[in-house]
Amino acid sequence: MVIENTKDISINTGYKRQEDALNTDSEDLIYRPKKIIKTNQEDAVHDLKYENFVSKNHVLQSDINGKKRDSNRDKAAVVTAPIASTHESNYEESVSKFKESWLPQLKDLIESHKTICESTLAYESDQAMASSNTLKRIKDLKSKPKNIIQLERLHMLSNGEHRLLSKDETDDIESAYLNLRSHLQVQEQVYAEKDHEYSLQLQSYREAAEKAKQDILETKENLSSELSISNIQLKEAKERLEAANASYQKLRREHKELALYHEKKTHSLVCNLNGERKSFGDFVENEVKSYKHEYANICESLRRALVLIQGSCTEKILRFKEKILDLLEMKQQEENDRISHIEYENDLTVKKLKRRISELEMAVKEYESEKSYSEKEYEEKISSLRIELEDKLAEIDMLRNKLLKEEHKHHSTSEKLEELSKYVASIQDKERNNGQNALELQARIQQLERRNEDMYNKLLAEEIIRRKLHNDIQELKGNIRVFCRVRPLLPSEESEYCIADVLQFPDKDALEPQKLILKGPNVESSLGHTYDRNYEFSFDRVFAPESDNSSVFEEISQLIQSAIDGYNVSIFAYGQTGSGKTYTMSSQDGMIAMSIKHIFNYLSTLREKGWVYKLRGQFLEIYNETIYDLLNKAEMLKNPKHDIHHDEKERRTTVDNVSIIDFNEEDTVYKMLNRAGENRFIAATKANERSSRSHTVFMLYIDGENSRTKQICKGTLNLVDLAGSERLSYSQAVGDRLRETQAINKSLSCLGDVIHALGNASNSTTKEKSHIPYRNSKLTYLLKYSLGKGAKTLMFVNVSPLKSQFMDTLNSLRFATKVNDTKVGSIKHYKR
């Protein structure tokens, strides 16, 4: 009995493990079909995979327990062999009967379970009830006897049979028992280790499967909710599309009616226009004179009104019709494409999910078949599935956002269509209101255009007269004029000098001051009396020290106008070193910069009269009777040869190997002036620390052409900053500075000789041609056509208010007086 109880304990222990596994699996099987009923087809597939996984683990555990059960059965058979020998036939019959009754039940159970798994795919709730009944049958089988020994014991007890074993049988049983006991202890230890190992593996498999199950359930819930939302949105989109189609049909009918109306209206307008044009022909000719004194702005306003009316009557209606049709067709096509795209993406998402589910099933099967896979590999698969699931969720969010955007676009398009329909109605009203005035406006515009053409022709004729009168005025003022400008005291000189002690301006308050008095040193007469020796000078204009560059430019702007009109003009700045010549000519607000600004501003007004001008310029320097190009520093170092050429027909002067720049903008001129100023020859003398040792000549070529009258004018503006004149005794120049000073004084003397010769030639009564010594200096030869026949010349004599420079100031004023006394007669007007 002790042996029998021991074996029963071992057998019952094995069956207890199997029963625990079955109980656990049974609870899962009972719980799972109830949830399958509440989910869709994808949920059923995921649950089916999990059931297969658990059932296979159950089979694995059953195999382990089966091995133990076979071992225990063998031991029990050895122990109970004497007991069962007398009833062997009854035992075999009972076993066969039990197998016959138990095996069919087990087969039915398996078939029923398979049927339940397959039926869940079709959402049938009655199969869930059948699954529940099958599980009850499994529990009933668990409550039955677990092994053959129990069956035999129950059979013997029910029959009341009891038999004692013989001594031989007892010895055999004891010896067999001892042998089997030692063998079974080893086997039990081995099976115990294997059982523990399999239990750990099974536990890990269950944990992983439970985790995967939770993730799949969450995924199913999210996907089902997103899919239901997508279906609702798709249904709403279809309803909106139907409404849009209905509105499209309505708008199409309205478009046809509008086209017929437009065609009739256009035909009637054309007929009316032709009739009215003929009837008003005679009336227009009689009323031309009555509109001669109307203002020019009426023509422009009426032209704009006609353009608006014509555009509103013709092009805008057609354009809006085309836009309406294009918008309707495009909107319908977009709605169809969007709906088809959403349906296609939904189908594609479902297919991808099904494909992914099938892949997961295959992965689970492979995972179950290959038990050697590690836990890390399984977790990697789960993570990859999560990533793919997140991607799908992101795609669903993107589709939802697209759908919302399309709804917003549809709403905005509908509003635009309503606005367009209202606008078309307003256009039709305007067309009806403005149709009557169109013919009158057109006739009036034609009259004003003819009047405008007449006025433009008169304006061109007046422009020619203006140029002639302007030139006559300049010739009356004198083709050679002299302006005197006195520079103010510097801050360092104010405490030491006083302007009133040196210079006086007797007609300072006059409209155009022209007199200047230079106060000399005291002189003692032969009788012993002392008196002030003053020198009075008179020029075309005298500028006091407080005069700025803008007031000076006002006086020379008329000469700039002559250059634009096609004459050669030269403006000189003459004076001793430090008298303000460079400030007058080349400063930021000097005569060169202000002349360029004035020219550009005036050319913009001439452009309205049909004139097109081209400006070109060059900047030269004459140093020691050698010409240099200030715009090309590299060539200055090479010192190329610059020959001067004169064109007698064009009365233009050109220089070889010199850079000529096209001036399209003002900034180009200012950049050129800065570059030229950096390359100029400057040296220090006793008279001035930074004395200009050369003459600079800025030559601006002004070429204009009128596209309507075919008139051409070519003028040249020369702005010259002469080198400072110095007395050798005062400057104390030696060496190179001495040669520079001598060359400067020589060229200035040649300039005076040329001007004096021009005056003599103009006043000569003989018919012989007087000689003008242009070739005595590079400066005078370069400015040949800007000093002589038909040219306008202005010389600034810049003087210093310092008493220490009295003699230099006196010499400069005497030279300027010599130039001012030169009178050049009126020259015939040359066509340009």
Curated annotation (Swiss-Prot):
State the InterPro entries in the record: Kinesin-like_fam, Kinesin_motor_CS, Kinesin_motor_dom, Kinesin_motor_dom_sf, P-loop_NTPase
Any idea which positions bind ATP? 575-582
Q: Which GO terms describe its biological process?
A: meiotic spindle assembly; microtubule anchoring at mitotic spindle pole body; microtubule bundle formation; microtubule-based movement; mitotic sister chromatid segregation; mitotic spindle assembly; mitotic spindle organization; protein transport along microtubule to mitotic spindle pole body
Gene Ontology annotations for the cellular component aspect, listed alphabetically = cytoplasm; kinesin complex; kinetochore; meiotic spindle pole; meiotic spindle pole body; microtubule; microtubule organizing center; mitotic spindle
Localization terms from the record? Nucleus; Cytoplasm, Cytoskeleton
Q: Which GO terms describe its molecular function?
A: ATP binding; ATP hydrolysis activity; microtubule binding; microtubule motor activity; minus-end-directed microtubule motor activity
Family, similarity comment: Belongs to the TRAFAC class myosin-kinesin ATPase superfamily. Kinesin family. NCD subfamily.
Q: What is this protein called?
A: Kinesin-like protein 1
Q: Please give the organism.
A: Schizosaccharomyces pombe (strain 972 / ATCC 24843) (Fission yeast)
